[in-house]
Structures are given as C-alpha cells and as structure tokens.
Amino acid sequence: MNNQITVATLNGKSYYKIINFLKSIELSYNELSPIEAINSGTKVIITSEKESTIFKKKNIIIDSELNENPLIIKAKILRNLTEPFMYEQLIIGIDPGKRIGISIFYLYDEIESIVLTCIECVLNLVCKILTNLNAKRKIVRIGDGDRSMANSIAINIKTRFK
C-alpha cells in the first residue's frame, strides 16, 4: 500500500496533521509535492483544501475531512484503494458482557477492534458506522455472552434504523 496513498501538500500545518493522522490509523504513505502527485499513479491523495483545486482526480481527501471519525476516514481510504469489483461488505461483530468487544471488518479488512464498557457508546459507534459507510451488504452479529444485553443492543439498533 506504500505507493497507493500520497501526502501532497506544501503547507506545514496540513502536512503535520495528515501524517499524524495516517500514523494513528497505521497506514503507510508516500510524500510528494502537489505538482509531482498530479502525474503519480497513486490511488488516494491527501492534501490541503487550497491545494486540492489543482487535482482532477476524484480520490482526493482534504485535510479538513480528517476531523471526522478516524474509523470512517480509514474505511473511505480503504474503499478508494480496493478494486471496483470487490464485493462491498461491512461486518460488525459485538461480544456483549461487562466489557463489550467490537470488531469491524470492511471490504475484508479489520479496520477496528475495540473494547467498550458503555452500551450507549456501543450503540453510537455502531449506528455511526452503519450510517456513514457504504456497503452493498451490512451485517451486525451479536454474540450471546450476556443474553439480556445482546437483546437490548439488537432491539436498540433495529429501532434506530426503522
């Protein structure tokens, strides 16, 4: 993936923000000037809003978009990196209990694995992901570690999407 994501900005603040973001979500990247990036074969270019006007490609991410949920941005980047014919599938696995485990797979890659202790936090995260990620098929699987909590989570998710 190293040559598929390019940071293309001459703006110091934008550069710092972009590379810190990419490091935090553990994605590798190339660094090019905006002019060099125009002719590169990279699939995703991340740049500042001002410099984005020189690019005609559609796979541009502007540094201001990085303020969104990092999980959503990582998923958008991965989607731009995959082949168009790849089956678009989002799977969210939830393991209820005192500590609620969540594992999220998007386009066959695990993009997040997290443990939360608050049901409301779980519901907010799951609903945000289901709302913001495009996939032809979205699956939420809930384990039966704590059956009453599993039922509560299932009912809450179902009612939020009716």
Regions found by a protein language model. Name each.
Residues 1-31, 37-72, 76-92, 98-162:
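Phosphate- and other anionic-substrate recognition elements at nucleic-acid/protein interfaces
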